[in-house]
Amino acid sequence: MKTLIIVLLVLVLVPFVSPQTEQLPQEKRSAIVDNLTVGIKSTNYGLRTGSANVLFDLINESYLQSEDASKSMIPLLTMLENGQTDEERIAAAVALFKLGNSIGIYRLRGVAIFDDNERVSKICKNLYYSFHKLNGTEYLIDF
């Protein structure tokens, strides 16, 4: 009897105790994406890398949907292609992976195959494989 009462209490109280992400209004989401896009386009290395990481975190924590953040895809593609450091390019690759846009995923494949930087290439290859494993889709190429 005690166990039944405990189980019922747990089933009733867990949904109230578990953390829930609050849904941001559309205006705030748009402002957040616009500010992060400006940061990604910045000439400051730390701001570019930090903006890409924050974008990934916000999508990962469900504060932003990948559709909301699609405006930042082109600057992220540019950052992945022309980044000055490995960390900057990796931050862009991870953010593109989290966006899940087919153009970004295809670009990860291109960097994985053709990039001379072994570290960036290996991470892009792993992100490319992970995306297809998580979504149950086919790879376009074996590395």
Placement of each model-derived feature along the sequence:
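Structural signature of alpha-helical solenoid repeat scaffolds
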Residues: 56-57, 97, 129
